[in-house]
Curated annotation (Swiss-Prot):
Organism: Blochmanniella pennsylvanica (strain BPEN)
Name recorded for this polypeptide: Chaperone protein DnaJ
Record domain J: where: 5-70
HAMAP family the UniProt entry points to: DnaJ
Residues annotated to bind Zn(2+) 1: 143, 146, 196, 199
Amino acid sequence: MAKSDYYEILGISKNADEREIKKSYKRLAMKFHPDRNPGNTTAETKFKEIKEAYEVLSNSEKRAAYDQYGHAAFESGSMGATSNSGGADFSDIFGDVFGDIFGGNRRSRAGRGSDLRYNIELSLEDAVRGIIKEICIPTLSTCEKCRGTGARSNAAIITCMTCHGQGQVQIRQGFFSVQQSCPTCHGHGKIIKEACNKCHGNGRVERSKTLSVKIPSGVNTGDRIRLSGEGESGKNGAPSGDLYVQIQIRKHPIFDREEKNLYCEVPISFSMAALGGEIEVPTLDGRVKLKIPPETQTGKLFRMRGKGVKSVRSGGNGDLLCRVVVETPVKLNDIQKRLLQDLSDSFEGPHGNRNSPRSKSFFDGVKKFFDDLTR
């Protein structure tokens, strides 16, 4: 598959100067950095393309070769590995530019600990009010016996003879030499002769740790809380990964939630719907009174401002929307049936259409529909 044009990747013209190249690179690298897009393979691929484009265009010799020969200038040539002496060193191009944004450089991040994810389920009440939860997570932590070296003792650690302790070797690629991790020591620069008998040379051991997580008020399903440095410990003193707490809200028996707003259904009697009245409705802060006007129909929404959920981002409160449902009476005795029949008969008089305007409109429409069909 053809590789993308480096200038297009960075969104710059072919006449862009060094300042424009660096500015565009910082902006795009910040946007697609893996730390900001954990688990997003598309962003990771884009980040690698951006980094590759910058490494070429920020170097005057590489840029000149690319302008003349395109990607062919960097097709693999001889692949002889050498120690880290002589030739151009491009290993810190990325670290120098990006270190001030995220800290550290590529070498220090090579052994960075893995990020962890923990799913936590909350009640709606806890999500709305906020809560502190204790969680217990399995993780890899630095071995206390060898302090993360993986060796039985300091004397059991020797310098790698392939890379002479640098952790990297140079590879010939096209017109230039580029660096990669040493295949002998895997980038560590040192080799362990005798492994620690507790972590068996890994430098880390499995254990569980308990953390207190502060859940802010207003969180919702899908929100994530990042605990920096609480993931797995890094290797050989590299930084630890992060812990991402994923929020899931349990279904509530009364309320449904949509962003900041809460919804609930409130049953009212046939007589209250017709005559009006006052009822108590539930809120997360307790019961409140709601006035029902006469002639209320099923499905009417009543908005109670500020009785919803506080936004975790804007801070403002949402509303509670109560949808009334007119309940049909059941298990009627003879007296009640007779009274309802009398009421129904009264609707059949000359003014009955006034009592059910929607029914009249509906059936008038049905009649017109069938009349039109028979013409």
